Regions:
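Non-heme Fe(II) oxygenase catalytic core, chiefly the N-lobe of the double-stranded beta-helix
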Residues: 13, 74, 78-307
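Catalytic core of Fe(II)/2-oxoglutarate
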Residues: 310-311, 315-401
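Short, intrinsically disordered low-complexity segments
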Residues: 3, 32-34, 212, 293, ...
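Residue-level preference for alpha-helix termini and adjacent loops
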Residues: 39, 90, 140, 172, ...
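Small/flexible residues
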Residues: 6, 35-37, 67-68, 215, ...
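Aromatic side chains
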Residues: 25, 40-43, 117-118, 340, ...
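Fe(II)/2-oxoglutarate
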Residues: 2-103
Length: 401
């Protein structure tokens, strides 16, 4: 059995404040950084995954590998939890009292979710991010221990009432994958077919989102044409090429927009916690992504057929082995920057970034000060197998500034 906790004593800079101390309290001297050893699943293939290779998501691919890695408990660090930002770290932690009854009956009531929870969460994003528009694409509920009960069928997009924790390191979309979903929206049917027209959004919100979406796509198309990239080319059985699929996001002058997940536990998390990667740390710049291109058919409110792309996280090069981890030598850390919130409560809401057009614009200017996305995954800690099943929810939300 893996050891559950590894305690490391570090000397922290004197100007750090404690996330567990009153405002203004300065930690003196030693700070104990708490880490656990977690079990992580990675895609470990060296090539580009084949189109629609859903065995990677199902966990049956021969290229998937399990690694035992250290995970830092954010509560043990001197950094206040409220100071993490999606622009610097890839994620934020927002405190919000539960806006709805978190009972299973309540959260599985579609009308309660769309008419009460959705508006509360989009208002939260407008408040904390300063976005002028935020629209929910969909939500997922995770409240079963594993996939054995329902079977995993990624082709239907997990359109089932209860899901298990998703335990493979990933970010939901590559930049082209996020744009693929955004461009697939079919006007004017999208809100009606996703049951978010009545009670979930207002007439001005819907009109603003669709108008800004058209402006965004027009600005992207101008930048793509200026870069000399030809139109998108689709050949059955092959990954798409051209158009926004070959564009790096630079020289875009339209409204800034992003794609986020709002991740919340309905009860205090006792097992299968969510790990997030701190993208502000230098080691995170070495993370490699494997693009898993997928086809989507007959999705509500979308064009009949389109492509998107998931970003599967590869293990760091020094770590490509069947299991375990090795301490680094020569001062160069090889440990991924995984962290988590121990016993995360329903009031502690993660905001995870999937995509940010501004990050790509800055990258095109040679600036690396804004994070594009946040890798994340459920992971397992030995000894927690018999704890209550994790009950959680994630909303995928478009934000436009």
């Amino acid at each position: 059995m893996l050891p559950r906790v590894v305690d490391i004593v570090e000397i922290m800079a004197a100007d750090h404040t404690s996330s567990n101390a009153p405002d203004g309290f300065i930690d003196a001297g030693l700070v104990r950084r708490r880490r656990v050893i977690g079990s992580f699943n990675y895609y470990n293939g060296l090539g580009t995954p084949a189109l629609n290779d859903l065995t990677i998501i199902e966990g049956t691919s021969p290229d998937n590998r399990r690694y035992d890695l250290p995970v830092t408990d954010l509560r043990s660090l001197p950094t206040p939890l409220s100071s993490y930002t999606h622009e610097k770290h890839g994620f934020q932690i927002i405190h919000q009292p539960l806006p709805i009854d978190p009972s299973p009956t309540s959260v599985h009531d579609h009308k309660i979710m769309t008419n009460q929870y959705y508006p509360a969460m989009t208002a939260l994003l407008r408040q904390h991010l300063g976005a002028r528009c935020s629209i929910v694409r969909k939500h997922s509920l995770r409240d079963i221990p594993d996939w054995n009960r329902v079977g995993m069928n990624p082709e239907v997009g997990f359109e089932i009432p209860s899901l298990a924790p998703f335990s493979i390191a990933h970010s939901d979309y590559t930049p082209a994958g996020a744009r693929g979903h955004f461009r697939a929206i079919r006007e004017p049917d999208w809100f009606v077919e996703n049951d978010t027209e009545t009670g979930s959004t207002t007439d001005p919100e819907r009109a603003s989102f669709l108008r800004l979406r058209r402006e965004i796509i027009a600005a992207e198309d101008r930048a793509i044409a200026a870069a000399g990239i030809g139109p998108e080319v689709y050949v059955e059985g092959r990954r798409p090429q051209g158009g926004h699929w070959d564009w790096d996001g630079s020289n875009y002058d339209g409204p800034r927009y992003g794609f986020f997940s709002i991740w919340r536990a309905w009860e205090t998390v006792k097992r299968d916690p969510l790990a997030v990667m701190d993208m502000s740390l230098p080691v995170s710049s070495r993370v490699e992504y494997a693009p898993l291109t997928r086809t989507y058919k007959n999705r509500p409110g979308c064009v009949p057929f389109y492509y998107s792309e998931n970003a599967m996280i590869r293990p760091l090069a020094l770590r490509r082995r069947d299991s375990g981890y090795e301490e680094s030598h020569g001062g160069d850390t090889a440990e991924p920057a995984w962290c988590y919130l121990s016993e995360q409560t329903p009031e502690e809401v993660y905001l995870l970034k999937f995509y940010d057009s501004e990050a790509l614009v800055r990258r095109g200017r040679g600036e690396e000060d804004m994070r594009l996305l946040c890798p994340h995954t459920a992971f397992q800690i030995a000894g927690q197998e018999n704890e209550p099943v994790r009950r959680s929810c994630e909303l995928r939300v478009w934000c436009i500034w």
